[in-house]
Amino acid sequence: MSIYDKLGVKRVINAWGTLTSLGGSIMLPEVIEAMNDAAKAFVNMEELQEKAGKIIAEITGAEAAYVTSGAAAALVLAAAACMTGDDPEKMARIPYIEGFKNEIILPAMHDNPYCRNLAIPCAKIVKVGTKDGYSKEDIENAITDKTVAIAFVFFTSKKGCDMEALKEVVEIGKKHGIPVIVDAAAELPPIENLRGIVATGADLVAFSGGKDIRGPNDTGFIIGRADLIKAIAAHGNPHHYIGRPMKVSKEQIVGLVVALQHYTPEAVEMRRRKWEEIVQFFIKELSSKYVKVERVMPDPAKHEYSAQGWPRARLIIDEENLGITAAEVNKLLREGNPAIYAPQSDNQITLNPQCLQDGEEKIIVQRIKSILSQAKKDVK
C-alpha cells in the first residue's frame, strides 16, 4: 500500500505536464537518495547556499546563482534586490518603501498571474505596449528615475517573448543601466535555455527546479549578476528580510543541485527519444474512424508553452458520431482510479508524455478505448 493509499488520496497519471497543481515532477532516485543523506546532519545554511550557488553557476555559465523556494520566490527576491541592493537599511524598510525607486517595466503581452510576485516587495509594475505586442520605444518611453528593472517573461517559441526579443530588451537595459529580470520557470526543455538565456546578458534569470529538471517541486533557482545574487542572498533565509518566509531546507538545496548535475544533454536526449516512442504508440493505438491522432508540437495559441520542440499526441474526436464530447471523455478520465489528467479544448485532448511513468501510456490507451467503446454502444 502506497503512502497515498494510506492517506486516501487518489493517484494521478499525469499526461498534462509539469504542473504545480499535480506535483510538478517525479524526482530522480539519485535526488531522493541525496536528500535522505542531507537530512542526517546539520550544516551552516549560508555555506551550503554559497557552495550550491557556485555549482549551479558553473553548470549554467552564470556569474552566480542562488537556490529559492520555487521560481515565484525567485521573482520576489529579484525585485527586492533590484530595489535595495544589499543595503541593510533599505532592505529592512521593505514593505515600507516611501521614497524608494520601485518601478518595474513589463511588456503587457507578458503579463500573467506570476508577474504579481514581482510586486510583493511593493514594486510598482508599469505595463507597456498591448497584449499583442510592444516596441523598443514603448519600453524606453516608460523609463523614469524610479525605474529599477525591466521584467521579461520568456517563452521559447512565442514571438515577442523569445530569445530574439529578449536580446533587444537586454540591449535597452544595458543602454540605460537597468537590470533585466527574466522569468523562465518552465522553459526547460530545450536544455539550451539553461545557459542560453543568461548568455544574452540578462541580469537575473529564474528557473523552476521541480519541473523538467526533476528536483524538489518546491525549489527554484536564480542565476545572473554576482552583485544582484549577493543582494538576493542577503534578503533570503536565514536573514530577517523579505525572503525570510521563503525558506529552503538543506534537503531541498542538495536535491536541486543533484538534479541539475544529472540534467545533461545526453540524459535529456534519451528522454526525448522515449517521449517520441510514446507519441507514436498513442498514434498507433488510438487512431480510428472517429478519432484522428496527430503528432503535434506545443502551440502557444493554446497556452502550451512548456517543453517547446518536443512532441505530443493530439486526439481530435468526432463527437457527433461517437456520441460523446472531448470534455466528457476528459471528465471520465479524471474520475477514474487512477485519475488521468490531460489538457482538453474544443473537440481535442492532448497527451503529453513528459511526466508519464513506465507503462502508464498503456493504461491511458486502455481507458480511452473503454470510454469511447461504451459511448459508441450507448449511441446505438
Label each region the model flagged:
Residues 59, 264-301:
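Conserved PLP-dependent catalytic core of the aminotransferase class-I/II
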Residues 1-27, 53-264, 268, 283-287, ...:
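Conserved PLP-enzyme active-site core in the AAT-like
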Residues 20-32, 42-51:
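A structural motif shared across PLP-dependent enzymes of the aminotransferase-like
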Residues 239-240, 333-341, 369-376:
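A common structural junction motif
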